[in-house]
Amino acid sequence: MALRTLSTFPSLPRRHTTTRREPNLTVIYRNPTTSIVCKSIANSEPPVSLSERDGFAAAAPTPGERFLENQRAHEAQKVVKKEIKKEKKKKKEEIIARKVVDTSVSCCYGCGAPLQTSDVDSPGFVDLVTYELKKKHHQLRTMICGRCQLLSHGHMITAVGGNGGYPGGKQFVSADELREKLSHLRHEKALIVKLVDIVDFNGSFLARVRDLVGANPIILVITKIDLLPKGTDMNCIGDWVVEVTMRKKLNVLSVHLTSSKSLDGVSGVASEIQKEKKGRDVYILGAANVGKSAFINALLKTMAERDPVAAAAQKYKPIQSAVPGTTLGPIQINAFVGGEKLYDTPGVHLHHRQAAVVHSDDLPALAPQNRLRGQSFDISTLPTQSSSSPKGESLNGYTFFWGGLVRIDILKALPETCFTFYGPKALEIHAVPTKTATAFYEKELGVLLTPPSGKNQMQEWKGLQSHRLLQIEINDAKRPASDVAISGLGWISIEPIRKTRGTEPRDLNEAEHEIHICVSVPKPVEVFLRPTLPIGTSGTEWYQYRELTDKEEEVRPKWYF
């Protein structure tokens, strides 16, 4: 058989064209009446037009050209990202550069204020001769300013003004400036130890602490538990604190109940810090006057038993006083063997606490010094409203004054309802008929009703301008209905039916399931309605632990004492 060549096959009707893209096989579709079109299996591009096929249009970019174009775009994108990252890093460095603990500026080890020799009345002042001598021997870090020396001897010298500051006295720095000194914490890896005063739990809680510290881990420390009444079960207190903290949606590593005075619970905090710091600096943070400096002194004393570095740090420890705003700048303390730093920070000054509205001379009256003993008032302890209205019928129509700072009008209550006040002893409580309450307040303000006290304080006093109506629901007559907490002062426990020896609370009818009161305080002091704090021996009897699911048990922080 003769060998067939390409010429022996019939001629194609039209020349066939292959696509210009490679490398897959080409499928040829034959039809005697139509053109032969070549289509690549791997590409879904539309067929090439006749003009392009015959060379009358611009050639499509080759794969190599497309690759180079993509590479150039990728490189340009990398440059832009690098510039953005560089800008962010620059801003972060600027924020951290504002960190007040500057080694080039020596600060008073008592309050953190920069040392200066020009203004005698300002924080940080030291004698020029002493300053030059200490500077010559490189001992400026061992200096304490004149203000701290006066504070250590009991003088009340405020230095903070502005929103959240304190009226009266000299105001050298604003509360906003002190908050700005803590702004770097959001951009820095640190371990935060947040302090809350148990006597002013709601007022000192710092619910928006994440705005200051970002995502840094937090250890929650409750201070001044030695002020709680005798017989208080710390198991109940710890569970109550954890429950309230979870309701406020604040995630913490653990909760610790402490007393800087008796050192109770401080060793547990020291162990937790050593466990969780992991090379990070440790910052003690909290509202003004919650006891940060006192807690640091107790912490150093506890750590010094095993750590020689902490023992050496005790020589120059922060000053502690009853004046809110004692600390005016972060104080660096070399307290750890690993080289991490411990910082005492300026208190966060809150405008909604009583300390922000009273005169600086009256600030000591707001701080409880001894264990709290509640002052209880029921119908048997109140005066009669008139000779025609015998005592013992109802609490309705009476008004309580808590010093000159709080007024409580009872609008609806049960005859057996009891109000128990927990706060500083310096503020006396007076009960009068509501119809004479306004006249009584105007007459006795500054005399029986203090603070405010003194002529100057009276002139600056703006009165009780904020009023809040509270409707308290009674779910169980055998336990207190609720606490009314006054920010920066204390709280009032409301017991629907006071329990007496040998008697049981009676059953309530449908009309007796609410208590209505009106609380008046100075602007902008806040009033909180919260679950009753289980204090004293009676708290152990009525407090109920909530049953937890497995998931709740897993995420719930542990508490220690």
UniProtKB/Swiss-Prot annotation:
Induction: Constitutively expressed. Induced by abscisic acid (ABA) and lipopolysaccharides. It is found in: Mitochondrion; Plastid, Chloroplast. InterPro entries: G_CP_dom, GTP-bd, NOA1, NOA1/YqeH-like_C, P-loop_NTPase. Its EC number is 1.14.13.39. GTP binds at residues 108-111, 166-174, 223-226, 260-261, 289-294. One of its GO terms (biological process) is response to ozone. Stimulated by calcium/calmodulin. Inhibited by L-NAME. Not activated by tetrahydrobiopterin (BH4), FAD, FMN, or heme. It catalyses: 2 L-arginine + 3 NADPH + 4 O2 + H(+) = 2 L-citrulline + 2 nitric oxide + 3 NADP(+) + 4 H2O. Residues 1-31 form a transit peptide. One of its GO terms (molecular function) is oxidoreductase activity. Keywords: Chloroplast, GTP-binding, Hydrolase, Mitochondrion, NADP, Nucleotide-binding, Oxidoreductase, Plastid, Transit peptide. Residues 175-351 form the CP-type G domain. It comes from the Eukaryota. Expressed in aleurone layer and the embryo. PROSITE patterns: G_CP. GO terms for cellular component: chloroplast; mitochondrion. It is an enzyme of class 1 (oxidoreductase). Belongs to the TRAFAC class YlqF/YawG GTPase family. NOA1 subfamily. Exhibits cGTPase activity; binds and hydrolyzes specifically GTP. May participate in ribosome assembly and stability and thus regulates protein synthesis in chloroplasts. The GTPase activity requires MgCl(2)and the presence of either KCl or (NH(4))(2)SO(4). Involved in the post-transcriptional regulation of the methylerythritol phosphate (MEP) pathway. Involved in chlorophyll-a fluorescence regulation. This is NO-associated protein 1, chloroplastic/mitochondrial. The gene is NOA1.
